[in-house]
Structure formats: C-alpha cells, structure tokens
Amino acid sequence: MADTSHLERMGRELKCPICLSLYNSAVSLSCNHVFCNACIVKSMKMDATCPVCKIPYHRREIRGAPHMDSLVSIYKNMEDASGIKLFVSQNNPSPSDKEKQVRDASVEKASDKNRQGSRKGRASKRNEYGKTKEIDVDAPGPIVMKPSSQTKKRVQLLQNLSAESLTKPTESVETAEKPKDYTENTVIRLDEHPSLNKEGNLSPFFWLRDEDDGENSSQRTESDQLLGTTPVNVPSFSDLMDSDHESPSKEDEQQKPNPGDMFDSEMFEWTQRPCSPEILPSPVKAKVLGRDEIDLTQKKLPKVKVASSKCKNRKAGSARNTVARRSIGVSQEDNMESSAAATISEQQDSRGTSGTIIRNDVNTDENVKAKRATRSKAQSTRVQSDLNVSNEADGKQGTKRKRSSIKSSPAHPIAGPNELSLGTEIVGKGDQDQAHGPSDTHPEKRSPTEKPSLKKRGRKSNASSSLKDLSGKTQKKTSEKKLKLDSHMISSKATQPHGNGILTAGLNQGGDKQDSRNNRKSTVGKDDHTMQVIEKCSTINKSSSGGSAHLRRCNGSLTKKFTCAFCQCSEDTEASGEMTHYYRGEPVSADFNGGSKVIHVHKNCAEWAPNVYFNDLTIVNLDVELTRSRRISCSCCGLKGAALGCYNKSCKNSFHVTCAKLIPECRWDNVKFVMLCPLDASIKLPCEEANSKDRKCKRTPKEPLHSQPKQVSGKANIRELHIKQFHGFSKKLVLSCSGLTVEEKTVIAEFAELSGVTISKNWDSTVTHVIASINENGACKRTLKFMMAILEGKWILTIDWIKACMKNTKYVSEEPYEITMDVHGIREGPYLGRQRALKKKPKLFTGLKFYIMGDFELAYKGYLQDLIVAAGGTILRRRPVSSDDNEASTIVVFSVEPSKKKTLTQRRSDAEALAKSARARAASSSWVLDSIAGCQILVLI
C-alpha cells in the first residue's frame, strides 16, 4: 500500500490543472505552472492569464517542458509494472497497442490513407455544395460574416498526412483545401519518421513524439474535428513577427517551393533546431507559403481543379464574406490597389474567362485616360507614370510580385512603361491571395493585430486566382472603404497634405461622365472610388517618380503659413504687419531654402524689439533679441517671446507687440519705438518730453510784453505770467519725492511745470531737496532716499513747502518745513546730517569695518551695504580675523528680521561668538539703521 500511496502522490503532481488528466505535451509558463499544450492553447483563446495564479502571459513565454513528459512516461510504466490504474490519462491505449504503434510503420500509413480517404469524401461534398453556391452567389438573403483569424495562423499539426498525398497533383490541391478554413494557406507533409522533415531537421516536440505515439492520436482526433469548423477570431499575443521585417531572397522566390518544408506547430509556430533543447521562433525560410504560390509551382494541375477548389472555398467561407474581405482591402498598405481590383473583378465576372481579364483591364485603363483627358493631358501621363513608379518603388517585393503575376498568366501581354494596366498594378500589389482565403470578419470587428499578417499574405499571392474569385459586392462597403482609406492616407502620408482633394474631385466628375456614357449605373460608386484610389496613389508617389513622370502644379493655394518667432502667430494683422523672412540678417523670399537658419518674424514685431535696428535693408541683433525673448513671458497672454518691455525701467511687464496693441491704455512713441504699459501711463514718453522742451523754448518772450497776450491763448498767458512771477528759483534745484500720495505727486508735477525745476525719480547726488510724506504726528517713513539724504546733508521737507512756494510765487525758506522725526522715534537726523555736511566733518562710519552675516534678503542686504558705504564704512567680504588693535574697529552685523531657519537669539549668539573670536563687536541691522537715521553712532549694548 505504501508503494501505491507514493504512486498516487506522483500521479497527482503530474496532472494538468485544466483537464485533470496526465500531462500531454507539457508546456510551462513564466510563473512555472505546467499545463498540457492543447489545454493552454484553448485557455489562451478566452483569457491570456495563467489558469492557476492569473498572471498574464504572452505566447512567447510558453516553453516546452519535456522533462514533465518524461515523468509522465515513467509514471505510466510504473503503473503498468504495478498493475494498478490510479489516473486515467487523456488517451490510454493498451501496452500492446503502444508497441505496435512504435514498431509497425505500415499500420500507421494505412491509418493515414483511411483518414485521407474520409477527408476526400467530405471535401467532395463540400465541392458540390460550393459549385451550387458559386452559381447562386447573388441570391438574396442575409450575408453571414463568419469569424476568421487574420493574424499569423496558429494551426493544429496534421500528424497523419501521408507522403503520397502531396505527390499527386489532384490530391495536393484537395488536401491543401481541407484545412483551408482554419490554417489559411498551410500545406504540411510529414515523412515516415515522425521527428524528421524532408531536410532532416527535427520537428517541433520531437522528444514527445518518440515517447508515445498513442498520445498523439488524441491530437489527430481533435485536429480532425476542428477542420470542419471556423475558429474563433483569436488576437495575437506576441509581437514576434519575423516576416514583417524580413523577406525571402530572390533565389528562394525562384526556387520551386517544397510544401514538406513548411509547417506550423500548434498555435505558436515553433521550430526545433538540431541538437538544441530551446524552442525558437520560426526563421524566414520556414514561413508557410500561400497555397496560391504552391499552385503556381505545380504546373501539371488542370484548371478544372483550381475552379473546384474555388467552389470549396466559397462553401467554407461563403462568397459574400470573400467579397466583404475584398471590400476592406488586404491591408492598410495596399488598400488603394485592392479597391481598384474590386472594379476589375466586376468586369471579369461579367465576362467569365481569364483571357478577357487583361482586355478588360486595358479597357479600364483607356477609360481612366479618357476621364483624365477631360482635365489635362499632363495629368493622364502623370497618373499612369506614377502607377508604374509606385510599382517599381517596392524594390524586391515589387519584382517578386511581378514575377508571380507573369507565372500565373503567361499569355497576358506586358504593358509599356506608361501603359501599365490596372490589372497588372493590382497583381503586382499582391491582392490575389484574398480570393482563396476564408471569409473576413466585419471591418469594425477586426482586431488591430490582424493588419501585419494581412500585409504578409497580400504580398505572397497569385494573380489568376484573385481575378477569378472577385465578385461585385463592394457597393455596400464603399463609404467604409473611403473612410478607412482617407484616415490611413492622412496618418501615414502626412508630408503630402495638399492637392489630393482637387485631383480627386476632378476624377470623380470624369468617372461619372464615363459611367453614364457606358450605361453602367451599377458600378458608378465603385468606379469613383477606384479613381480616388488611383489619384491618391499617384499623389503620394510623385516624390519617387523621378524624371519619367510629368509633374503638374496643383491649382489650389499651397501657400505655407509661417509662425512669427516673437508672437508665435501665423496670421498677418494690422497690429503685427506682414510676415518677413531674414537669412543671416538679409531679407529673403518666403520660399528661400535656408533651413532652420531662416527667421520668420512680423514686421512690427521686429521693429519694436528693443535692441533691433536696421542698417539699410540688413537687420541687426535679431537673433540676439529672439534668444532673450524666449525667456520672457507676455504679461497679457502668458506665452514666451515677449521682447517689448515697458519704457519705465522699474516696471517688469513685457508684452508681444500684437498683445500690447490690443490694450488701449498703452502709450506708444513711434519715433523712439518705446511703449508705456497702463501701470506707468503717467510717465512721459521721449516724444512728450521733447514737446515740453519745445513749448518751454516758445515761452521765451522775443517781443514786448504788451504783444504777448495777443499771440497766445488765455491759459498759456496765465502760465507765462506765473513763470515770470516765480523769482529766486535756481536752475540747479532738483527735487525728489519719497512716499508721496497721488495727490501730492500731482502738486509736485504742477509746481515743476510752473517753476521749471527738475524732478528726479531715483536717488542721485544731484538731488537738493527730498519731499517726503508725513503722518499725523509729523513723522516720515524710512526710505532709501530719506536715509541717503541724511548722510549727504540734503533738505528733507514736507509737501507744505511746495504749497507755500506756489502760494507766494517765490522761493520760501525751508527751515520751517524740515522734517525732524521718523516713524521709529529717531529725532533731529536731517538737521544733524546737514550740519555735518556744512561743517565738512568726516562721514558717520569712517574707519569702521562691517561684516554682514546671517539670513538677509538679497534686496535688503544690498540696500544695507549701500547705506554703509555712503556713510563711509567698509564692507568685508570674508570673515574677520583677530587684530592687535586696542580699539575694535570691526562690527559683525546680524539680521533682526524673522527667519524660518534660526531664531533671533541664535543669530545673536552666532554673531557674538564670531565677534569674540575676531576681537570685534556684534550689532544688529536695526542698530545700523538707527545710527544713520539719527546721524550719530549709538551705543552698542
């Protein structure tokens, strides 16, 4: 019993979690869970996650597990030796049957022939039904769209195909047709040895087939069951598509294909290299050839067999589904040519023989020439040449397609370089493979991963079979084809955006006239769409047409819009001016080929840039201004490129010229090319200052006083009288305002206009009087001008002095109006400063050195340093060192402003420690300001 329990435990470990039977062709996932190959294949159709742990996986992550199959084989041998059957495997033949299957190859051949015969019987029935279906292809009724896989085909291996089935021409065609519904152009041949193909390479899972042929019987049975059904449209779970990036060489194309060398293993297209346990992707030489190419190589096949195979295809996929598949094209790459093929197939169906196909194509080509001749002869030659060039531009692929076209119809005449028929163009593009393929799904239901495989199958196709199987059911899908074509043309050919609509409209009009002339109203929509496709193809390929094609200039407007480098706008407005183009400073035309070195700017944007000027026609500093403006955002729209700043230097607003023109409050100087923003509208522009100087010059009397009132207006006369009445004002008198209100500034401006004194906005050593604002207590705020005026010994007066001068119309003494106190309580600072300057005493901080440490705001620290230097002190850039001087002359200044890093106590202690080590004194920033405001050095605490 102990042995039985161990055997039972081993059997549980060797069970598949899906089918609960012993592993059959075991494979493992990236999560190390093991399943049967067939089980995980079926599971992946519904959900690409591990059935045990639900971890997502891709098809490339599935790897064979031969060691598990070896364990299953050992387990079965142990069961046979013990005589106990604990678990039932997926197929459990008797030991005697196993030995017979391994030893006797003749029995296997016989069973293969029997199965082959049964398939032939079923195929003949489908053949008969297909013939009736072909006759009644236009019968009324709903069109049933059966799903079909459009990706790289995943097939069940046909384990039991005999070698004789591929040697006979008739059996080869019919055998390739039977799995057609599921395998899509796959022909498989296995030799007598189950592990070797014709070249002697090991087949996939060869280690499994040597173990037990009895287990493969279940796979054969399952494959037989799947042959009669259409598989579910399964998306591809792998991005390994070797054939999308590689193509067979010319030698491989010219060689006669051997279907015995081509096979797919299950759904993964694995192959096994000799003496290698790794499962690798299929190489290029092992790709499955389309059955149409195989039909080309077997020249002994009669045409009757080809017709019967077409009928069989119509039974499996239905003729209407084939037409639906043709309507949406083989792929996004070849959809234009496939639409043209749909029209040609209609003409072919109305005539019925392949011999008339080329004649119809020639007629179609002549009709196209007649339509285009209504517009111009040059357009006809261009379109036909572009069709030919488009076919030649495909390189090796195009050469191979032309070769396959010639093989399929050797009696067809070859068109000239400018007379390439539509039929030859379509054959070269490889649409003919779709006629024998299964029915396609609806365009909206197609998986995105199906397109690459459609491209592959479209390139490996046959001409005659395509032209014979096409039907005229494309009218219902015309609108959908136009949408898909237009969207693809826009996305993939964005470099050719102009001219397509104009040419297409003309061709549509010509196509309608030609159709009405031939009384073929049923094909109007299809012919129009064919013309659109051909015109789009010629427009796209005109760049590669070389000198063989005649190019025609489009009638539409192709003016390219340029974007201004400053305002980022491409439209020319009255505010921006016209668009100009400069190459290395020189003006050029719009179509000048200078690359990225050509600068496109509006005329006004360039003229109003601050540092840009013109030397004759050459523009100077344009690139420098562009570099500067790329870092400046517009105060109006927020975009970069705002080169135009406010005339007020202290204002930080910058604008695009076009944005500033939209603001009515902005003031402009068209002479100096400067602008004032709405916030500084009260400031005078250079042109206004010049006008005021001119007015002052005109006010100088050149005639007697009695004639003056007759020459000027009453208001000007009053001002002239006021100016004459102000006596005692020196021309060197310069006023500066400090903290005044708007009303007080207005009084100052009026006084300056009447008296002729100068007003300075910023502090300067030439300032003689500082007019400051005071509160109800007579104290003024500490400003930079106030502190500098104390150190320089200037007058610091209230606004009352200005009012007194205007009232008395003469110079009034300043002493009664001098400010004596600031808001911090320091008194007599302005008076002491004036006395120090009058007596020519040394400055306040003469002989003292200051080291500023701690966390100061940059602006505050800069103002503090300016005040110390103006007071005669010295700023140390490095930490002070100890000196032998008896009297300490170095002061370490720390900040008293609130800071997030350190408290006031910590900053004070740090300054005192540094001062002690350097034999210096520590002082706060408020001590420095108080000393300057009082014009005397205060005692350090």
From Swiss-Prot:
Annotated stretches, region: Disordered: 87-282, 303-528
Gene name linked to the record: BRCA1
Top-level taxon of the source organism: Eukaryota
Motif mapping: Nuclear localization signal 1: 298-305
Tissues/organs with expression: Expressed ubiquitously with highest levels in flower buds. Mostly expressed in flowers and siliques, and, to a lower extent, in roots, rosette leaves, inflorescence and young cauline leaves.
Subunit annotation: Forms heterodimer with BARD1/ROW1.
Residue span(s) of domain BRCT: 724-819, 840-941
Protein name: Protein BREAST CANCER SUSCEPTIBILITY 1 homolog
